[in-house]
Amino acid sequence: MHATRSPRQPRGWWWHAVVYQVYPRSFADGDGDGTGDLAGLRARLPHLAALGVDALWITPWYRSPMADGGYDVADYRDIDPAFGTLAEAELLIAEARALDLAVVVDIVPNHLSVRHPWFRAALAAPAGSPERDRFHFRPGRGESGELPPNDWRSEFGGPAWTRTTDADGKPGEWYLHLFTPDQPDLDWNHPAVRAEFESVLRFWFDRGVAGIRVDSANLLAKDPALPDLATVASGAPHPYVDREELHDIYRAWRRIAASYPDERVLIGEIWIRDAARLARYLRPDELHAAFNFAFLGSPWEAARMRETIDASLAAGGLAAAPASWVLCNHDVTRTVTRYGRADTSFDFAAVAAGIPTDLALGTRRARAAALLTLALPGSVYLYQGEELGLPEVEDLPPQARRDPVHFRSHGENPGRDGCRVPLPWSGQAPPFGFGPPGTLPWLPQPGNWAPYTVEAQEADPASPLWLYRRAVGLRRSLAAFRDGAFRWVEAGEDVLAFRRGDALLCVVNFSGRPVPLPAGHTVLISSEPSGGDTLAAHAAVWLTPSPPAGPGRPRGNTSTDGNPW
């Protein structure tokens, strides 16, 4: 059976966009309390404009107890006071637009905070009450209901169920949470849940946001029977991952997005490796785009990377939607560190502390990966600090850690704090311009980060910041990145090469030795210094055809020794 190709989606700005992910708590602190905020972000918008990105995606900025970095939302229509006010958010959206930057915000629909009025009302109401119908409350198993209702496990470790206490002080029902106990899952079979989130979408679209990033987009729908995973037959629908009911939800959301004069964008966080299954979310009446997590997790190996790129382009092709590319985000090990290890892949199950890392090698590979990613067709998502080549901070003191993943694993998993350390902007010592002098950032910055600051890198043409600015600028200015057809060029073992139309050739060397480059081309940009005839180890280059040579003048590399071109 062959997958059916969907009609092509209209090509809006998101098809080729470079989107910069802002984790506001760690971006810039305007008031000196140690927490990044909207004042800091507004002051640093010129950095994003200079970088050349098309949009910024802001992770949750809503009212929240911050049990999971803001992904436990208490009020979807207000800004957390730690970040600022709703009025400031509206100013930010307008100021970004004036700089030709679109704003994408995060919506967290699978769950909300235990502090949300809905859940407070549910806890105050008795079992079987309408207030509890918006969640998954169930009696426990066992003689006294002392066992969880089923065998589901939290994504962060431990059971996916927490028991409540009734008004009389006795143990009560259990509620479902696929993440932390502070994040009860909503029941998307309840019409009030659907109506509420459709209203939330309109609330933010009305305020000028250009798009919505949908958190955990493939987890919302649950089998009403909540069966034990151990009883689900092989090949049967999963009780809470990638269920058929999801598509009706996103069709309704797409109708809302399409109702605005300049259609707004829906981008899904969807952890599905099957390209055909992923493509179903990208049909013309559902989501516009989805994150490419297979690419993020792929090791630094030419063959594996090519397989991942082919599968990703196939998924987009099936849905006639843009591919998307991401190397890092606020949940995963930073690229420089991951690429400096023996195992360069990423898997949540394999996250551990104390893995030997060669940061110099990781930096070379990360620079090459930046050019690879920015040359691919589709949209690119760039996590804050990647443009500075920041490594993972692996030596945070135990008392400084905040991530529930770390605590729920009893310290075995280092958690995600290491990729969330506040950005360095200027100066020679912490807080490195993150906040006013004397600011104590909410996570401590390494004392040796002075070379990573924006200030230091702006003065260094060999810095990661210069590389990103030049590459993003070329991507914006060259038509090949918008319209150039993608096709592989066979270039030998450990090398990937592809063309975008006839005007651009990208070559990536995954090996530890120099490799020859094709004749008749001029270097546009290289991740490492290039002599013109060869590409350095663990490096990438963008080439364009050279003008015709005059009589007796060679065109680039004329050597045929070991040259696959």
Residue ranges and their predicted role:
Residues 524:
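Flexible, gly/pro- and Lys/Arg-enriched active-site loops
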Residues 1-520, 528-553, 561-565:
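Active-site and adjacent substrate-binding regions of carbohydrate-active enzymes
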